Structures are given as structure tokens and as C-alpha cells.
Curated annotation (Swiss-Prot):
The gene is pta. GO terms for biological process: acetyl-CoA biosynthetic process. This is Phosphate acetyltransferase. GO terms for cellular component: cytoplasm. The N-terminal region seems to be important for proper quaternary structure. The C-terminal region contains the substrate-binding site. The lineage of its organism: Bacteria, Pseudomonadati, Pseudomonadota, Gammaproteobacteria, Pseudomonadales. It is an enzyme of class 2 (transferase). Its main location: cytoplasm. In the N-terminal section; belongs to the CobB/CobQ family. GO terms for molecular function: phosphate acetyltransferase activity.
Length: 704
């Protein structure tokens, strides 16, 4: 599926018109299209509905999600809730994209009150993994100045050489004055721009060049009445007639006659009987004036209106306002040029006109090109929460009175991410909640370990009888809440376990290895971090468990990590990381990675696995082409397997801090049932996502 993000280069470029035309062009190509306007930008005094979504619904019959109100967006941005905002937008986008081949996403328009629009558009395009089409309108500028302005905007999204930045559509283009007609003038403009602009190459192209058409901007006479809150003396055809030109008449009739042409709105004081009569005579002679607008609060003489009856019955609209000529003209100048949501005729004409000036063959070819979607960080977080909510699993938290854990459990319970079980004394949990201002939602389970501990003694002895465990020893070990929670998991009373906010990694994993054991086909437990980089999610393993894995261990970690990536919608291209690429180096460490690569390929010949690869060769396309030109993984790796814990843990923390990215994990792999360890510095958000990951693992491991 393709997602096209339509981004304006400035104010007044006609963004909605371009969206309408693109949708029509895509429909002509036989594609199932969707439309999404993430954020509503209503003009002052505009009470809605949001214009773009409503026009798309009326012209294309699409059910579009309701955009977020601008006030809500500004509040979330002001509160530093950009991630939450993007997740909410992705939730709406999923509705628009359901069962579609291509989705048009319309970005924000920069205005005096929304100077942050460009930054928001950047984050929206990245989060939706969208291909960007810029929309610009030439102003009074040279071709060089126009090109520079477009390139500056393209740089916001990665530059014109970024494969996701497709090109530009120029709207409202006025051709050369000496051209035979407007179409020829615009064609000549497009040719000169393409020939002389270094910006417009094959990888950044001119996708469309839309000529300026006065008639497409013509408002209905009724729209003028609404704008001015005018009194309607005679409605006539004011729903159908369009204002092509406004003429302020203060001169004598002989000097006015030549101005009375089709589509003209005549503005004159209400006591200018001569102008009123002249306009009426013109109308009765077949000139379809847009209407008469009488100003200065002078009501027309009834006798004059009686003389004009033929014109009025013929459909001539007559409006009246209290303001004088100057103020009326000023108010008319403030007319919003956008298409009203109920003007279906104008919307259809604009849609067809724009669609006819889009490079249809290129658009069809682009949509027919398969494209691997990258999972952006907000999309990953959204997906994790959605899948956890759908799983509905019961997750035990043995550190039940730890403040961060209590808050995370409350969030997960309230959002339906998991059915959380806090293992702690109820009065301690209540005290923490009161001190932290946490509202404990209904249904949040709190189990006092002292009241249930005894019933796990016998089952634990049975599980560990081969290791010489007796009842007194079991009772002593069950004093540890992590051991008690692990027994609950072993007996299938819960679906997963999350611990580590105050316990060490060993304290979390050891009971799991003793009581849960490894999953069939696995000999060890490892871990991965999901690294939420700005434009994609990568998987790092192992960064938390195995200090110095052997070649066979490393191969197993690679296979486990690839499976984890695929389980969360990330295509698995596995890079076995070393200080050397290919055959360029030798030594014990690089030989271990080389052997691990061979073993992993033997175990899973269906996976893309390559190594040894240096990190830059694995991650950066240009370096990968130079250092490992024949590698199926180099430059596009999604799963990074580090040779030891020292390298893995150092790298994950360095990337996390230097790239200022969120990491989710560690998520443990290889256990028969999901147990996950937290960093002791984990934030509440980290715990929430770890609980969600655990719920998804439990769902994946559940018997069919």
C-alpha cells in the first residue's frame, strides 16, 4: 500500500483542491483510495465541519475519520505529548487505510497562528511512513526563486534526493502573457522550469502543473450573502449564479453599461435607482449578472423594485447590507476563496480540472511499484497497544507496591492493555496510590502474598523434586515475591510476568529458568531491545542477558531475535555484528561471529542472515554497498546481533542517548512462558510497554 502525504510549501497553495484531484486521478487508475486529514484547521468564525474531509466525502463518497480539533493538538504539543498525539493520529489513519490500495493524507497549512505546521507535517509523514508530495503555487518570483523555495521545503522531509520525497505539484500557475491560451502558457512554463531547474530530476519530478482558472474560484452569490450577513431582498438564482467579478458602481449609467457583463456582482448604494434600473434592464436583456448588492442601508424604492419585477422574476439576486461602499468592499476582499462544503458543483469542477493536469501515467506506475513499509515508532507503539488490548492477558507484577509499577498497572488496566495483578499488601498499594495521586481503576487485582503463599509450596516441591527441594526450602524461596509470581505463571494462573524495577535481572530470570524452563527447541534465554529510531524500529540483541555467548549461542540468539522481529511486524534482515566486515579481518572474536552466521543459516535457511558486518555496513546503504556489495543484508539490516553483552549493552545505550530515541525492553526470548525484566531505571511508560509486550508474547505462545 502507498500513503501519499500532501505537504504545502506555504499558505494559499490550494491544498484541498490538489487532494481532490489526486483522489480522482487514483480512482481513474482503478485503485481503492482513502483520504485522511489528521488535524482540522478551521478559519475564524468557521464552525465546521472540517472542509477537506467533508468535500472528499461529498465528491468521492468516502467515509473519512473525523480530524482532531486544532485546540486539542496545540494543547498536546504544549504539554510535550507529541508521541501520544502521533499515536492517536495513527489510530485514525488505520481506519482510513482499511482495505485501501492508496491513502492521501493532507498535511497542515502554515498560517500566522500555526507556525509549527511544518514541524508537525514532518512528524506526521515520518510516523505514517508516507511518501511526500509537495504542493506549491508560484508567486511573483523567478524560476530560480521558485525552485529554491521548493527545495527548502523538501529539505524538511529529507531533501529532494530522499526516495520518499517524490516531487511537487504546482497549483494556480499563470502562463506567459503572450501565450496563445492559458494551457499553452502553462505548458511552456512547465517546460522551462523542468529544463532549467537542477531540482527536477527523475527522482524528484514535476507531478502536475495546474493552470489558474478564474471560474474555478467563483463563489456563489449565496456565499456573498452569507459572508456579509446580507438581507436577501430577492433570492432569485443566488444558489446557482457565480461571482466572476465585483464592480463597485458610483459613476453615471452611461459609464457603467460596459461593466454589466455575465458573472458581475454590482455593488452600489441602495439609493442609486439609475444603477438598479440599468442592472435590471441588462438582466432582462439576457445578461446573467451575479447579482445586485445594495449598500449604505438605503432600502430601494418599492416603485423602482416594481419596475424591476421582470428581472427579479428572471432570477436576478438582490442583496442589501448596512455598511457603506468602502466597508462593503473591504469585507468582500476578506472572502474565503476555499470551496464551501455544500458547493458540490464547484468541488466537482475543481476535482476534474486538477485530475486532468496530474501526470497520470507516472502516478499509476508509482502506485503499482511494491513498497516495503517501515514501522515508525508511533506506529509500533500503536500496534503494540492494539495487539495487547486484543489479547486480553493477565499479567502478574511481583513488585506490586513499587510506585512506578502501581501507576503502570493502573494505566494498563484503565486502557485495557492487560489485566494486571499486583502482588503486594492491599494497604501498601492504597498508600502508594494516595501518595502519588494515582486512581486505581476498577478490576485491578491486588493479591496479598502472605495469604496465598502456602498453597504454592506443594506444587513447587513437585516441580523441583529432581533438584532435592523440600517443603521448608520451598516456603523460604516463596518469601521472594518474584518466585511466588513465577509459580503463579508456572501453574497457568497468569499469562505473563514483569519484574525488575527493584530486582536484578538475575533475580527475575533465575526462578523462570528453574520453574518455567526454556521453550521447545531453545537452549538459552536471551533478550532484545526494540530501538525506536526517528523513522524506523530496529531490534538489538542480546543486550541484557548473555555475557559472552558461544558461536552456537549467538546463532540461537539470532534466530530468536528474528522471530521476535517478525512477531511485531518488523521484516527480519539479520546482521551479525563484528569489528570486521566479511573476510577483511581475522581473530577469535570475528571467527566466532563468522561461525555463528553459518550455524544460524543452517538452522533457518529461509531467513536473510549475514555476517560478520560492521555496524555502519549493516545500517547505512552507501557504506553497505561499498564494504559488502553482495550482501543481502548490508545497508538495510533490521535485526542487529552483537557478539557479546559488553558490545550490545554499550551500543544500545549509546544509540539511545545520542539519537534521543526510546527503547522498549529488554524483552526476554526463549522461555516457555513470557517473563520480562525491567531496567531498574525504567520509567512508567517503559513498564506500560513491557507489560504490553508480555501480553503479546503470551498470546503468541498460547496453544491454538
Amino acid at each position: 500500500m502507498h500513503t501519499f502525504f500532501i505537504a504545502p510549501t506555504g499558505f494559499g497553495v490550494g491544498l484541498t483542491s490538489i487532494s481532490l484531484g489526486l483522489l480522482r486521478a487514483l480512482e481513474r487508475a482503478g485503485l481503492k483510495v482513502g483520504f485522511f486529514k489528521p488535524i482540522a484547521q478551521l478559519h475564524p468564525g468557521d464552525l465546521g465541519p472540517e472542509r477537506s474531509s467533508e468535500l472528499v466525502a461529498r465528491t468521492h463518497g468516502l467515509d473519512t475519520p473525523k480530524p482532531l480539533p486544532l485546540a486539542q493538538v496545540e494543547r498536546m504539543l504544549g504539554d510535550g505529548q507529541l508521541d501520544e498525539l502521533l499515536e492517536e493520529i495513527i489510530s485514525l489513519y488505520q481506519r482510513a487505510a482499511a482495505d485501501k490500495d492508496v491513502v492521501i493524507v493532507e498535511g497542515m497549512v502554515p498560517t500566522r497562528h500555526a507556525s509549527y505546521a511544518a514541524r508537525v507535517n514532518f512528524h506526521l509523514a515520518k510516523s505514517l511512513d508516507a511518501e511526500v508530495i509537495l504542493v506549491s503555487a508560484p508567486e511573483n518570483e523567478t524560476l530560480t526563486e521558485l525552485t529554491d523555495r521548493i527545495e527548502i521545503q523538501a529539505q524538511l522531509f529529507g531533501g529532494p534526493r530522499d526516495p520518499k520525497v517524490l516531487g511537487v505539484i504546482l497549483n494556480k500557475v499563470r502562463g506567459e502573457a503572450d501565450a496563445a491560451n492559458a494551457e499553452d502558457g502553462v505548458a511552456d512554463f512547465a517546460r522551462r522550469l523542468t529544463e532549467h531547474s537542477p531540482l527536477l530530476r527523475d527522482d524528484f519530478r514535476l507531478i502536475g502543473c495546474i493552470p489558474w482558472q478564474d471560474e474555478l474560484n467563483a463563489a456563489r452569490t449565496r456565499d456573498i450573502a452569507d459572508l456579509l450577513s446580507a438581507r436577501v431582498i430577492n433570492a432569485g438564482d443566488y444558489e446557482q449564479r457565480r461571482v466572476q467579478k465585483i464592480v463597485l458602481c458610483a459613476r453615471a449609467v452611461p459609464n457603467t453599461v460596459q461593466l454589466l457583463k455575465p458573472g458581475v456582482l454590482v455593488v452600489t448604494p441602495g439609493d442609486r435607482d439609475d444603477i438598479i434600473l440599468a442592472a435590471s434592464l441588462a438582466a432582462m436583456n439576457g445578461v446573467p449578472l451575479a447579482g445586485l448588492l445594495l449598500c449604505s442601508d438605503f432600502p430601494p424604492d418599492p416603485r423602482i423594485m416594481e419596475l424591476c419585477r421582470g428581472a427579479l422574476q428572471g432570477g436576478l439576486p438582490v442583496l442589501s447590507v448596512a455598511t457603506g461602499s468602502y466597508d462593503t468592499a473591504t469585507n468582500l476582499n476578506r472572502m474565503n476563496k476555499e470551496i464551501p462544503v455544500d458547493d458540490r458543483e464547484r468541488a466537482e469542477r475543481v476535482t476534474e480540472f486538477v485530475a486532468g493536469h496530474i501526470d497520470f501515467e507516472w502516478l499509476k506506475q508509482r502506485c503499482g511499484t511494491p513498497r516495503e513499509l517501515r514501522l515508525s515508532p508511533p506506529a509500533f507503539r500503536y500496534q503494540v497497544v492494539q495487539r495487547a488490548q486484543k489479547a486480553g492477558k493477565r499479567i502478574v507484577l511481583p513488585e506490586g507496591s513499587e510506585p512506578r509499577t502501581v501507576q503502570a498497572a493502573a494505566i494498563c488496566q484503565a486502557r485495557g492493555i492487560a489485566r494486571c495483578v499486583l502482588l503486594a499488601k492491599p494497604e501498601e498499594v492504597q498508600a502508594v496510590a494516595q501518595a502519588q495521586g494515582i486512581v486505581l481503576p476498577e478490576g485491578l487485582e491486588i493479591i496479598d502474598p502472605d495469604l496465598v503463599r502456602q498453597r504454592y509450596v506443594e506444587p513447587m516441591v513437585e516441580l523441583r523434586k529432581g533438584k532435592g527441594l523440600n517443603a521448608p526450602m520451598a516456603e523460604q524461596q516463596l518469601e521472594d515475591s518474584v518466585v511466588l509470581a513465577t509459580m503463579m505463571l508456572a501453574l497457568d494462573e497468569v499469562d505473563g510476568l514483569v519484574s525488575g524495577a527493584i530486582h536484578t535481572t538475575a533475580s527475575t530470570i533465575r526462578p523462570a529458568l528453574q520453574l518455567i524452563k526454556t521453550a521447545p527447541g531453545y537452549n538459552l534465554v536471551s533478550s532484545v531491545f526494540f530501538m525506536l529510531l526517528p523513522d524506523q524500529v530496529l531490534v538489538y540483541g542480546d543486550c541484557a542477558v548473555n555475557p559472552d555467548p558461544s558461536a552456537s549461542d549467538l546463532a540461537e540468539i539470532a534466530v530468536q531475535s528474528a522471530a521476535s522481529a517478525q512477531a511485531f511486524g518488523i521484516p527480519a534482515r539479520v546482521a551479525m555484528i563484528s569489528y570486521s566486515t566479511g573476510d577483511s579481518g581475522s581473530g577469535v572474536d570475528v571467527d566466532k561471529v563468522r561461525e555463528a552466521t553459518r550455524l544460524a543459516r543452517e538452522q533457518r535457511p529461509d531467513l536473510l542472515i549475514d555476517g560478520p558486518l560492521q555496524y555502519d555496513a549493516a545500517a547505512i546503504a552507501s557504506v553497505g554497498r561499498q564494504k559488502a556489495p553482495n550482501s543481502p543484508v548490508a545497508g538495510q539490516a533490521t535485526v542487529f546481533i552483537f557478539p557479546d553483552l559488553n558490545t550490545g549493552n554499550t551500543t544500545y545505550k549509546a544509540v539511545q542517548r545520542s539519537a534521543d530515541c526510546v527503547s522498549v525492553g529488554p524483552m526476554l526470548q526463549g522461555l516457555r512462558k513470557p517473563v520480562n525484566d525491567l531496567s531498574r531505571g525504567a520509567l512508567v511508560e517503559d513498564i506500560v510497554y513491557t507489560i504490553a509486550l508480555t501480553a503479546i508474547q503470551a498470546d503468541a505462545q498460547a496453544p491454538a
